[in-house]
């Protein structure tokens, strides 16, 4: 197909259209259409440049048998103009444009003539220039004709010469000059040139509006060329249209593909972003949910701990109340069983002949009478707790019953106190007696309490005031007065105990006082404060008791001992 087009274009003459090419070049320069693109589509300026270069090299194409170097030259010139196209692309583009031009001229596109193809005028001029061949210089006779201005409706039909130059030479030329008016030939509408609005059929002008051109003779070869051209045009019109439609379809498909891929990637990107946002939101919600669960678990654990502590506290209070109720019931039962007041110990005769017998009898009598005293004093003590509710078993103050028990035990041991020697074992024995009665007091505390109540007794006695029985200041005045009166009446000093009895008693007492050593060490700190506060509260007994309570750091507790028989006492004494 391209070979037929090249043969047709190479067989056409072309050397007389210089002025037309110059006008076309000027027109393209005035429009300002320049650099092309390197894509598949050929812009209009680039196509015009290709047609101009091809028309300039038309003579070279007709004279040369090798067309490839010529197309390389066209590609180079296109490169100089700024259009990067290969020789193959230039050749294909020119063939396609020429094919479509032929189809347009035949009127098979279904559109009005002159408006169907944008390069119609350029290709028509190129075809017109190619249809004339200059006459050889060696030919003496020239056939010329003076062409006059024809009406605007008339058109010039260029004759395409045969491809064989010898046929032209053999034809008989017209040897005379004459004026002719060329009428349009309708037998071959393919070669009808589009006429401008002027009356001149060609763009060739002279000074007198007449042009002398060579008129070739009409021969049979002309009809053959016309028929071959018609066949070429009909065979290539369909391929040109298909190529153009294919190019247009490719452009549309490429655009659709780009649009499709662009939309696809945009959609994928949006989906990815949405998924990431959902994952981030889910992650934050999970963290918040876990934090709330942790806080709720901590709150629940805290509530459980508080409930457990409250239950333990209530259980402890209940157990203590039950224990207190049991102790009160036991004490009341013992009080009912014991009956009256404990008997006072009998007075001992302090005779030298009865000293040893007195010691043993005194021990047995004291121990035998102590259980009853324990029951009575304990009952009185617990009754005082129930009535007043002011003194608890863990208080450090000396209740009245405890002080009375101290005075009673001290009175029972008055004979031993009058003896010469150290008084430490005596107070240890008093402390042991207090412990048997249920009062946990050390020997040192018992001694200090005894000295304090005696000091108050002396001060009250020196005031020479008559004390009533229910006096609140020094309520033990009458008991102490009876003790001192009895001491004054007896007058005789008791003899010291045998030496063999003292170590045994000291051994018994040392076992009982061993556990009280640490308590005495803690109580040394408040000893000095006891004396200072005790002196400032001389008038009122309540103040004196409060001062002693602040100084005393030890606690007392109720100890319910079972009744000991005299035999047990003797066994403990001599072990």
Curated annotation (Swiss-Prot):
Q: What is its main location?
A: nucleus
Region feature (Disordered): 1-44, 157-181, 232-256, 339-364, 513-575
PANTHER family attached to this UniProt entry: FI21293P1, TRIHELIX TRANSCRIPTION FACTOR GT-2
Q: Which GO terms describe its molecular function?
A: DNA binding; DNA-binding transcription factor activity
Compositionally biased spans, kind Polar residues = 355-364, 561-575
Positions with biased composition (Acidic residues): 528-555
Protein name in UniProt: Trihelix transcription factor GT-2
PROSITE patterns assigned = MYB_LIKE
Question: Per its database record, what is this protein's job?
Answer: Probable transcription factor that binds specific DNA sequence.
**Superkingdom of this protein's organism:** Eukaryota
SMART domains per record:
SANT (SM00717)
Residue ranges annotated as compositionally biased, kind Low complexity, are: 1-11, 161-172, 232-241
Alphabetized Pfam families for the sequence? Myb_DNA-bind_4
Q: Which GO terms describe its cellular component?
A: nucleus
Give all residue intervals belonging to the Myb-like domain: 40-98, 390-454
Q: What is the lineage of its organism?
A: Eukaryota, Viridiplantae, Streptophyta, Embryophyta, Tracheophyta
Q: Which Gene3D superfamilies match?
A: Homeodomain-like (1.10.10.60)
Per UniProt, the keywords (alphabetical) are: DNA-binding, Nucleus, Repeat, Transcription, Transcription regulation
Q: Which gene encodes it?
A: GT-2
Species of origin reads Arabidopsis thaliana
Compartment(s): Nucleus
């Amino acid at each position: 197909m391209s070979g037929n087009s090249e043969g047709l274009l190479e067989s056409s003459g072309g050397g007389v259209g210089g002025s037309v090419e110059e006008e076309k070049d000027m027109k393209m320069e005035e429009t300002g259409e320049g650099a092309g693109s390197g894509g598949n589509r050929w812009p209009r300026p680039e196509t015009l440049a290709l047609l101009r270069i091809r028309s300039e090299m038309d003579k070279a194409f007709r004279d040369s048998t090798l067309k490839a170097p010529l197309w390389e030259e066209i590609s180079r010139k296109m490169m100089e103009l700024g259009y990067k196209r290969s020789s193959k692309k230039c050749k294909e583009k020119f063939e396609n444009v020429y094919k479509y031009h032929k189809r347009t001229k035949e009127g098979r596109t279904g559109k009005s003539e002159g408006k169907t193809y944008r390069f119609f005028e350029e290709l028509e001029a190129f075809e017109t220039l190619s249809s004339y061949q200059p006459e050889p210089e060696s030919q003496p006779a020239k056939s010329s004709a003076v062409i006059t201005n024809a009406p605007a409706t008339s058109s010039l039909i260029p004759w395409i010469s045969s491809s064989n130059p010898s046929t032209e030479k053999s034809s008989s030329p017209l040897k005379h000059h004459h004026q002719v008016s060329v009428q349009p030939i309708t037998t071959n509408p393919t070669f009808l040139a589009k006429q401008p609005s002027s009356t001149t059929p060609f763009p060739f002008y002279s000074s007198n509006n007449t042009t002398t051109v060579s008129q070739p003779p009409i021969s049979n070869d002309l009809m053959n060329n016309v028929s071959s051209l018609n066949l070429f045009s009909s065979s290539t019109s369909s391929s040109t249209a298909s190529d153009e439609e294919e190019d247009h379809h490719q452009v549309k498909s490429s655009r659709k593909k780009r649009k499709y891929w662009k939309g696809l990637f945009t959609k994928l990107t949006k989906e990815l972003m949405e998924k990431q946002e959902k994952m981030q939101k889910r992650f934050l919600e999970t963290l918040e949910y876990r934090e709330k669960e942790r806080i709720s678990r901590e709150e629940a654990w805290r509530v459980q701990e508080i409930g457990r502590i409250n239950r333990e506290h209530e259980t402890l209070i209940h157990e203590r109340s039950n224990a207190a109720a049991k102790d009160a019931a036991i004490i009341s039962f013992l009080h009912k069983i014991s009956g009256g007041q404990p008997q006072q110990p009998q007075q001992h005769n302090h005779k030298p002949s009865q000293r040893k017998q007195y010691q043993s009898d005194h021990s047995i009598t004291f121990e035998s009478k102590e259980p009853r005293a324990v029951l009575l004093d304990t009952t009185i003590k617990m009754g005082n707790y129930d009535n007043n509710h002011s003194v608890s078993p863990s208080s450090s103050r000396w209740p009245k019953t405890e002080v009375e028990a101290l005075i009673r035990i001290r009175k029972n041991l008055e004979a031993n106190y009058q003896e010469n020697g150290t008084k430490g074992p005596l107070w240890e024995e008093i402390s042991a007696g207090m412990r048997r009665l249920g009062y946990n007091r050390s020997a040192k505390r018992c001694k200090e309490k005894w000295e304090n109540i005696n000091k108050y007794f002396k001060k009250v006695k020196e005031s020479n005031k008559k004390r009533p029985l229910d006096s609140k200041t020094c309520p033990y005045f009458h008991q102490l007065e009876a003790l001192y009166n009895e001491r004054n009446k007896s007058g005789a000093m008791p003899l010291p105990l045998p030496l063999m009895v003292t170590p045994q008693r000291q051994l018994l007492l040392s076992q009982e006082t061993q556990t009280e050593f640490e308590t005495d060490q803690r109580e040394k700190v408040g000893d000095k404060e006891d004396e200072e506060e005790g002196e400032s509260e001389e008038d009122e007994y309540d103040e004196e008791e409060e001062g002693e309570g602040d100084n005393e750091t030890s606690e007392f507790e109720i100890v319910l001992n079972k009744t000991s028989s005299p035999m047990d006492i003797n066994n403990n004494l001599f072990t």
